[in-house]
Amino acid sequence: RQRQMCIRDSFNTGFISRAPIFDNTFINSQSSHERNPDAKNEKVYSFELGYGYRSQYFSANVNAYYTMWKDKALYDTGSYEDVNGASQRWTMNMTGAQANHMGIELDFIAKPFRWMEVNGMFSWGDWRWNGTAKGFMMNTEGQIMANSRGEVVTDMSNVDQYKYTIEMDNVQVGGSAQTTAALGVTFRPMKGLRLNADWNFFARNYADYDIDASQATQKEAYVVEKPWEIPSWSTFDVSAGYTFDFGKIRATLSGNVNNLFNQEYIADARDGSNHDWETATRVIYGWGRTYTVRLKLNF
C-alpha cells in the first residue's frame, strides 16, 4: 500500500501599530471629552516558528512564538476613602507599559483505526508585564487627584508632579491560564453514530494585578508584586450524535454535557493585598455542569 507523508516548516513575523483602547484615549472617558496627551499607538512585534507533520494515521503541529507589546495602554479603577471617610471610586489611565508573551504549542490527531480518533494539545506560555507605567489618578468627576485621599489638583502649571509611577517588571499577566492541555477521543462504532469524550486542564492562571490606592504615592514608584496564582483545575466533557433518515428527511440528534463531574473551580480573580485566596476580590467561578440537546433536520 502506498503511504503518503508531508513535512512542512514555517516562519512568520509581523508588526502592528494600533490605536490605544477607548478608555485610554481620554483623560476620563466616563465624564469628559478631554483627550489624553500621553496616549500613544500600541506597537506589537510578533515572531512565530512552526513545524508540521502529516501522514495517513498521524498529524501534528508544533509552534513557538514570541510577542512584544510596547506602549501598552492600561486602565485601572478602584476605591479610596476620602477626607470625610466616605468610599469613592478612582480611575487611572496609564501609558508606557510593556508586555512580553512567549511560549510553545503542540497539537496532534491520531487515527489508529477507521472508527477511532485521538486528539490532543499542550500549550505552555510565559506572559509577563514589564516596564514602567505612568498615569494620573482621577475622581468620578474627571478631576486629577493630588493624593489618594481625593484632594483635587487646582494648579495645573506643573501637573506632571501628580503622576503615579507603576513598576511592573516580571509581573505575570492575569486572566488566562498559561499552561493548558487537552486530550480527546472520538468513536464511531456504527454508521451514523459518534461518541466523544474530552479532558481539559488549566494551570498557572494568575489573578489580575491590583493597585492599592492607599499605598500609592507620587513620591516613589508603586511596585506591583507577583499576583495570586489561582489553583489549577480540569474538566471532562462528553458528547454524542446520531444521524439517521426519517422518511425523506435527514436528521441528526446530538447532545453534550460540559463539566461532567461538576468540578468547582475559579476562572478569574483580582489580586488582593496579601496575594492569596483570602484577600482576592472579584472572584469568578467557572460554569458547573451544563448540557445541551439538539435536533437538526435537513430537507
Summary of predicted features, one role per range:
Residues 2-7:
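Short, small-residue-biased leader/transition segments that mark boundaries at the very start
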Residues 66-68, 87-212, 296-298:
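Gram-negative outer-membrane beta-barrel transporters
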